[in-house]
Amino acid sequence: MSAKVREDLVLSHAVVTAEVEAPFDHVDIAQWLKTLPTHEYQRCAPPDHKAAGYTVDDDGTPMSINVEMIGTGLVVQQYRFEVAEPQYCKMVSLSDVLTPLGWTSTQVIWELLMEQLDGDQCRYTNTVTSHPTEDFLEFISKNGQTFPEAAEARQEASGRHCRLETPLYAQSIARWAAPPTPQRQPRNCPLGPRRPGRRSTPSPYGLDLPT
């Protein structure tokens, strides 16, 4: 088995766009990714998205870990931040895939781009490209499937998934970039005064986070 990536073969390629209102100068996709709560990630593609987290690779490169269903496969995406800019990120993962027939692997390249159209009117582009590994090619051959057949199935599944997540990602990035809404203080608190050192900060996702 080999995890060598076959960049000469394309397993799937999906490009989906969504327009959204967002303060363009405050958009920071890299920071949004690094601070994305797992439940917000789930809201961006229900029920496909399962969990998300942030870590670093051995060399210190930031990584985003995403667990999601693509078609019938449970995919563990281990994205390295290859490009991390406010309006553009390129994430590259050697991903583990659990299929009904067992485990295999693919490379996934995820590109996130926000462009300003006019004022706060923006366009978000979600691009996902997948290449097979040698392991993947051996896996499908062993199970009686040709590469064109596997690519057709993956293209359909990836396209459907991207169409689901793209507008929801755009809205989530826009909420993160929006200025915080001032909180109204209650006149009377039936539970008594707050404990010292405990306060709430507004979350861009509509939740009050204790700090």
Regions picked out by a protein language model, each given a short descriptive name:
Residues 146-192:
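Long, compositionally biased interface segments
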Residues 1-61:
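Hydrophobic ligand-binding cavity/cleft-lining segments
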Residues 28, 73-77, 134-138:
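Short acidic, gly/pro-rich beta-turn/loop elements at beta-sheet edges
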Residues 23-26, 83-88, 113-123:
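A short, structured loop/turn motif at beta-sheet edges
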Residues 191, 196, 207-209:
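Leucine-biased recognition of intrinsically disordered, low-complexity hydrophobic segments
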Residues 200-203:
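Serine residues within intrinsically disordered or low-complexity segments
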Residues 96-160:
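Beta-strand/loop substructures that line and gate deep hydrophobic ligand-binding cavities in soluble
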